[in-house]
Curated annotation (Swiss-Prot):
GO biological process: L-leucine biosynthetic process
Cofactor: Mg(2+); Mn(2+)
Site (Important for catalysis): 133, 183
Function: Catalyzes the oxidation of 3-carboxy-2-hydroxy-4-methylpentanoate (3-isopropylmalate) to 3-carboxy-4-methyl-2-oxopentanoate. The product decarboxylates to 4-methyl-2 oxopentanoate.
Residues that coordinate or bind Mg(2+): 216, 240, 244
One GO cellular component term noted in the UniProt record for this chain: cytoplasm
GO function terms (MF aspect): 3-isopropylmalate dehydrogenase activity; magnesium ion binding; NAD binding
Protein name (record): 3-isopropylmalate dehydrogenase
Keywords linked to the UniProt accession: Amino-acid biosynthesis, Branched-chain amino acid biosynthesis, Cytoplasm, Leucine biosynthesis, Magnesium, Manganese, Metal-binding, NAD, Oxidoreductase
Chain's gene name: leuB
Organism: Corynebacterium kroppenstedtii (strain DSM 44385 / JCM 11950 / CIP 105744 / CCUG 35717)
Chain residues that bind NAD(+): 276-288
Amino acid sequence: MKLAVIPGDGIGTEVTAEALKVMRAALAGSGESIETTDYDLGARRYLRNGELLTDDDLASLREHDAILLGAVGDPRTVPSGVLERGLLLKMRFVLDHHVNLRPSVLYPGVTSPLSDPGKVDFIVVREGTEGLYAGNGGSIRVDTPHEVANETSVNTRYGVERVVRYAFDRAQERRKKLTLVHKTNVLVYAGGLWQRTVDQVAQEYLDVTVDYCHIDAATIYMVTDPSRFDVIVTDNLFGDIITDLAGAVTGGIGLAASGNIDATGTNPSMFEPVHGSAPDIAGKGIADPTAAILSGALLFRHLGKTDEADAIEAAVRNDVASRDGSIRTEEVGTRIANSLDS
């Protein structure tokens, strides 16, 4: 298995090392191994030579089965938006990572801000390359009293359908329920396309129950009845917002993993923890590597290593449930890896 590894900045290097440790432990005895290539991408490289992501970088990344990312950014030295647009979004569009996958699980032992959350275990399938993030907009008469700015949400049948099909496939593997989240009563054109696509594709997945929530109602249900959700499919902007809410409901983004996926398999998909680079604690050995480890499990699952993914997720669940509150980065990774060897 050939993995491109982007440790990135801050705690990214530390948590990625533990993720790889656990992934190798999960593969032990299978006859398979992980071959890694490290890429110096992120704030450090940008500050050193002004480069973000070159054509040579992209060509080299494409030679791998998948990409494991730690975290990038340093708000102390790089202005907001530079790395997001020039590195992360560029990679997403060029490598056609049209699916953003975000599992949301409330693990035993983790405190939710909800008084009685019940069992929380759902995934959000967010469209990643269209919508309001497609970059279709502009401004005129800037810095005048008559300034005009617009951002156009771009939604294509092709783009919507491939994400909807991916969501239905995931629903078939899970509890067989899919919820479309949008705002069809106001966004009648984009919302109409999403609703019609879901209705039509649903005819091929008759064992999956389908329902619909306006985005505002979905945020209410996520804090009053999160167990109602199994697979949520939604557009780029709504998905960006609702996944952060899902992270908060399940104890914070420190445990949240994500996948940026080319569902066709043409390009390598990328997996990363949702948390940032946390430069304030970098090098102290206290960063929680759990989200990075769970990102490794997502990577395995994407590549068909279901048993290994299941084993990592079970090991994480057991470890999180038995923690005493203190975190040492290397100790957590070693403990989870050793539990897979036993």
